[in-house]
From Swiss-Prot:
Cofactor note: With its partner (PsbE) binds heme. PSII binds additional chlorophylls, carotenoids and specific lipids.
Gene Ontology cellular-component annotations: chloroplast thylakoid membrane; photosystem II reaction center; plastid
Signal peptide segment: none
Name of the encoding gene: psbF
Oligomer and partners: Heterodimer of an alpha subunit and a beta subunit. PSII is composed of 1 copy each of membrane proteins PsbA, PsbB, PsbC, PsbD, PsbE, PsbF, PsbH, PsbI, PsbJ, PsbK, PsbL, PsbM, PsbT, PsbX, PsbY, PsbZ, Psb30/Ycf12, at least 3 peripheral proteins of the oxygen-evolving complex and a large number of cofactors. It forms dimeric complexes.
Membrane-topology descriptor: Single-pass membrane protein
Protein name: Cytochrome b559 subunit beta
Domain of life the protein comes from: Eukaryota
Coiled coil: none
Length: 39
């Protein structure tokens, strides 16, 4: 009842957090890997 109402908000928030976190982690990981490879 209250779960049915808060569930879509939680999923949208979860998608927004992961949508921003995944590219950020991948971007930082690629930058650090490039710096380690160059040196």
């Amino acid at each position: 009842m209250t779960i049915d109402r808060t569930y879509p908000i939680f999923t949208v928030r979860w998608l927004a957090v992961h949508g921003l976190a995944v590219p950020t982690v991948f971007f930082l990981g690629s930058i650090s890997a490039m710096q380690f490879i160059q040196r």
